[in-house]
Design a protein with these regions (language model features):
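Post-DEXD/H (motif II) to motif III coupling segment of the RecA-like Helicase ATP-binding lobe
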Residues: 1-67, 74-79, 83
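Conserved segment of the helicase C-terminal RecA-like domain
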Residues: 18-33, 175-178, 182-215
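Short glycine-/polar-rich loops that comprise or flank the Walker A/P-loop
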Residues: 18-22, 41-44, 117-119, 159-162, ...
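Loop/turn-to-beta-strand initiation segments
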Residues: 18-26, 93-94, 142-145
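Conserved strand-helix element at the start of the C-terminal RecA-like helicase core
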Residues: 23, 74, 78, 84-113
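A short beta-strand-to-loop transition that corresponds to the Sensor-1 phosphate-sensing loop
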Residues: 26-30, 49-52, 99-102, 148-151, ...
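Conserved helicase motor
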Residues: 99-103, 121-133, 147-154
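A short beta-strand element within the Helicase C-terminal
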Residues: 156-169, 179, 195-197
Length: 221
């Protein structure tokens, strides 16, 4: 991102390479087009599926949650989701919670602050002015729960974090974004494990493909 699925950038890179030059694509989440070129022999694929600490990637656990929006509309938290958050908070590990939309993320923050008054809760999105400060506060332990849109799906590391994705079957959570989100868990030598929960009201192709691809990477490792 923003290279993926952008024909203009692909064309610009292709035209910039010397006649005998090489193009190397580095990605944690391949695309259908790159996979097609590998199958046709146009590209060769090299995989590094194992993490630096040698432990496997965390497999997402799908969790059925059908009443999220119904309770959110009432400015309440689904009892089932609340129960999972309560259980997670007893561990003492930070919780990174992904919401599908900015408005829902803002609503979640307000509700969680009311339901969990002892927690320090933040929310970040593409329009959050102090996003970097909140991210650092979460990393430093000054925030215990951070709610985010897909803006934090990649490029950040939070030691020992657990991740919940609410409405994981939402159209904005693609296979690639779910894999990237899952990659936030288990990155630390101190805790190479963690909880990775995909809350949904219907398993879709993105969730299934993300789980399958993560399982395949573990097999290759």
């Amino acid at each position: 991102f923003p290279y993926v699925d952008n024909p203009t950038l692909y064309h610009a890179v292709k035209n910039s390479v010397k006649e005998n030059g090489l193009r190397i694509f580095l990605t944690a989440t391949s695309t259908d087009e790159l996979d097609r070129k590998v199958r046709s022999g146009e590209l060769k694929r090299l995989s590094l599926p194992r993490r630096f600490h040698g432990n496997p990637l965390i497999i997402p656990k799908p969790v059925w949650l059908s009443d999220f929006n119904r309770y959110l509309d009432k400015k309440c938290l689904s009892p089932k989701l609340k129960s999972y958050i309560e259980k997670q908070r007893k561990t003492g590990y930070p919780l990174l919670l992904f919401a599908s939309e900015i408005k829902k993320g803002e609503q979640l923050k307000e509700i969680l602050q009311e339901q969990f008054p002892n927690e320090k809760i933040g929310f970040v999105s593409s329009v959050t002015e102090d996003r970097l400060e909140q991210v650092q506060a979460f990393r430093d332990g000054e925030l215990t729960i951070l709610i985010s849109t897909t803006i934090l799906e990649r490029g950040v590391t939070f030691p020992c974090v657990d991740v919940f994705v609410v409405e994981a079957n939402h159209r904005l959570f693609t296979k690639s974004s779910l894999i990237q989100i899952g990659g936030r868990v288990g990155r630390s030598m101190d805790r190479p494990t963690g909880d990775l929960l995909f809350f949904h009201d219907g398993l879709n192709a993105s969730i299934k493909k993300a789980i399958k691809e993560i399982q395949q990477m573990n097999k290759e490792a």
